[in-house]
């Protein structure tokens, strides 16, 4: 097929407040050339995550970048070219993926992405419905099964701190569909309480008084905690609630330290989850992300998982992406926002 030599993208050269005119700008770039393991994808929809806002704010905090940086770490699109070592994909296939934080992102008409972190998109979902799922599903899956090492058949308890966001919602759904865990999730507003209940949480508690809220449910300790909201702010509560020999995982970095020795008496563990680790370090098991997305797509098509789409923005412009970033930065969003190109 005939492809253009250039493409439109939205990027930035300065880390500015999203309300400022040049916080995101429209640019023209050369069409990416796929590497030997790459798919070249014509992007049809994508989604914005907190990672996008963090990278935009930090990448050029004290400098102006020589070349615009393009972010975007969720996408659905059509394969239009591929590298010589790609297997399992053909031109014309519809795919979805989160991508690689070290490479240009999906805020562009075309994107080159490693086929080992890509899967065929769910057949029953629209582009917008599918676009909101890769990053949060991969994060939730890795946290549950790779970091916390949950065994699907064990009847234990999981506390999700930050249940109404994308990762929290995915964690609740996956845990309830694929394990025997009792899931407790935090929510602090009526609308978020309703949402996490719809996601499948067995108990909904308020994070403002976390220990007492959990224990009011008749639960003294929890076997697993996944924090997707505030690691340092909830540290003492997590230490109090974690069961002896339990495990805590988090995706939220923090300034300063926490006292890990508080976990020593319980022989409890703490482990980070970063969805980009496998692609960042080109790990030997990088293809596991393709395998996870394959299973997520099947679960979505079977109706066992629900898309987290709550809003769709339409059009490819800097203003549309700014609106999506404002939604994320408000910290009050429920579910996820997609951008339909």
Model-found features: residue ranges?
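A structural motif shared across PLP-dependent enzymes of the aminotransferase-like
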Residues: 102-114
